[in-house]
Amino acid sequence: MFCYQCEQTDRTGARPGCASAKGNCGKDATTADLQDLLVHAVKGIAQYGAIARAMGAPDRDADRFVLYAMFTTLTNVNFHAARFVALLREAAQMRDRVKAACDASARAAGTVVPAQHGPAMWQPADDLAGLLEQAARVGVDNGLDKVGADIVGLRALVLYGLKGVCAYAHHARVLGYERDDIYEGIEAALAFLARDPDDVNALLTQALGLGRLNLTVMELLDSANTGRFGAQQPTAVRVSPVAGKAILVSGHDLGDLHALLEQTAGTGIHVYTHGEMLPAHAYPVLKAFPHLVGNYGGAWQDQQSDFAHFPGPILMTSNCIIEPMPQYRQRIFTTGPVGWPGVRHLEHHDFSTLIRAAQALPGFPATAAEETITVGFGRHAVLGVADKVIDAVKAGQIRHFFLIGGCDGAAPGRNYYTEFAEQAPDDTVVMTLGCNKYRFNRHAFGDIGGIPRLLDVGQCNDSYSAIRIATALADAFECGVNDLPLSLVISWFEQKAAAVLLTLLALGLRNIRLGPTLPAFVTPGVLAVLVEQFGIQPIGDAGTDLAASLARHAA
């Protein structure tokens, strides 16, 4: 295996990346290699999918399969090697179906389908050993000896950003929202990668194009979330347990949570959120269920402790699963793209097995003293008081805004974000999103003239809200976003964050502080380009960076 797609990748060798029997995320070499081969297979689907679309015959099932398949290869999503063997065979069948449709359309038009090469010609080997042999030839570092580390790193930047785009598009799709132009853009990016591009400018152009596509995808996902569940509202969320039977829901999928709430209504079972599901409490349709009683635990990397102590079953939706510990292995369930060998997987929103487990397990014996945190400051809530915010800035009550958000993780150096937020002066406002918020969301920040100093915008999926808030402020002050008293301090971990970063760069945002370490696939040569064109900066000392941010905008 060779994998360097996440922030926690091995950096102890001469070349960063996980290249042993098991990666730092817990993914074994077999699964990692099969994931590489699945990406290769999906490129082949896209090659013919682009032709089919140009002929006026797009295949919606193939479009959806591409999203799902790519999502399964994100960090901490699916660790089940047997599942990837099945997906590889399904990918070949899907590719052949799209190819047959292309051939039929061409015959009807009296033309022929242009010859395809590379991934479009792949055929799955008969057994696992053969598949692994194939995978060894199509890994992310394929061609390193010919094109060098900079080109391989830029290809990885495009690929990992594309994985994030596909994940966000899948989130929207399962809520019933999808668009042809998004599928077209994803196909085009995959077909681009299928050609093994080796031009720096073409790769950078493609990366920024994906950033623009991801903005469209996040806008669609925002429409999906608000269309299905209403606009977020500021809401106090209980973070201490209530006596009774209990189910814990982690991940990101609001649709799964909604289906579970419907199925548990009237059963006496309490439902708790975990990790990135915390913002669910701000959506009117979801918080209307009285048995959605609170949030339990912290960010995804705390799950082994959180889940072990939770007295009920756990449902893992979308990404962020870690190897289940023996204390809860028999009471954790997966759904959607998530998978772990030996863990029961639930399909089609049928949560009856999960509910029976909750009824059999003890639940919380007593109600603890109430503690709350406040969420729900999405774009509708913040822009609804925009006049008040603008007046506070003009009056000198608000000096600066910080967006401190992104993915959390267990690596050393992430206390930087806690220190940065807690040291922010009292005349500044901190916006946050993603699970990075758990680093400081129990700190008492207070308010400025009734405006909370800590504004929880939502999930990492809600980056669109943060962008809309920033652009609305820029419009109000008749300036560019880069001219606002606003600093972006971003924590990254996996490929959704890579997609969001590309979106910020595509929008022309500069001087982003990124950490806790820079992506391993960003070579010194690529970093030099990003620094020159976008002013990207690695994080340093929290106090020093905070002072520099305030000084830059005060100058």
Swiss-Prot record:
It comes from the Bacteria. Its EC number is 1.7.99.1. GO terms for molecular function: 4 iron, 4 sulfur cluster binding; hydroxylamine reductase activity; metal ion binding; peroxidase activity. Its cofactor is [4Fe-4S] cluster; hybrid [4Fe-2O-2S] cluster. Binds 1 [4Fe-4S] cluster. Keywords: 4Fe-4S, Cytoplasm, Iron, Iron-sulfur, Metal-binding, Oxidoreductase. The keyword Isomerase does not apply. GO terms for biological process: response to hydrogen peroxide. The keyword Oxidoreductase applies. It comes from Burkholderia lata (strain ATCC 17760 / DSM 23089 / LMG 22485 / NCIMB 9086 / R18194 / 383). InterPro entries: HCP/CODH, Hydroxylam_reduct, Prismane-like_a/b-sand, Prismane-like_sf, Prismane_a-bundle. It catalyses: A + NH4(+) + H2O = hydroxylamine + AH2 + H(+). One of its GO terms (cellular component) is cytoplasm. This is Hydroxylamine reductase. Catalyzes the reduction of hydroxylamine to form NH(3) and H(2)O. It holds the Pfam family Prismane. It is found in: Cytoplasm. Belongs to the HCP family. [4Fe-4S] cluster binds at C3, C6, C18, C25. SUPFAM superfamilies: Prismane protein-like. Hybrid [4Fe-2O-2S] cluster binds at H252, E276, C320, C407, C435, C460, E494, K496. The modification Cysteine persulfide is found at C407. Its main location: cytoplasm.
